[in-house]
Amino acid sequence: MRMPEHLQRLIEPVVTGLGYELAGIEFDARARVLRVYIDHPQGIGLDDCSKVSYQLSGMLDVEDPIPGQYQLEISSPGLDRPLFTLEHFKRFTGRRVRLQTLRSLDGQRRFKGEIAGVRGDVIDLEDDNGLHAIPFDLIDKARLIPEFDI
């Protein structure tokens, strides 16, 4: 899942300028919702989201990158963090992920397994059926599967 580049160019400098990492951007055209995921080594709280929302709202009102009205949502990536970049897949190698591809690969579009590694622009995903080499450009959506110690 890629971040919309035109939005990333506008949003990332604001988010990083406030001391946060831009973890991802999603725009749901049907619901008219722009979701911006932010992260920080010390975690994200409501005050962090409010601060980023205030700064982004002003900039987005001026730049007007999305025609019409929409709702802006700022949040942490959460336990089931979406993965947007190759760097995200590298960072979370060894973790379990659920992903969907744009078209069928190895006879399926939905995968659930462990990120075994990243080679160039290919994600190696291991599941019960073996190792799948999934080109990054074919990934539509990907999210970590939360792990709980019981």
From Swiss-Prot:
Chief localization: cytoplasm
Gene Ontology CC terms: cytosol
Localization annotation: Cytoplasm
Key words of the record: Cytoplasm, Ribosome biogenesis
InterPro entries: Ribosome_maturation_RimP (IPR003728), RimP_C (IPR028998), RimP_C_sf (IPR036847), RimP_N (IPR028989), RimP_N_sf (IPR035956)
Gene Ontology process terms (BP): ribosomal small subunit assembly; translation
A Pfam family it matches: RimP_N
Signal peptide range in chain numbering: none
UniProt superkingdom: Bacteria
TM stretches of this protein: none
Family: Belongs to the RimP family.
Role played: Required for maturation of 30S ribosomal subunits.
This protein's name: Ribosome maturation factor RimP
Organism: Methylococcus capsulatus (strain ATCC 33009 / NCIMB 11132 / Bath)
Gene label: rimP
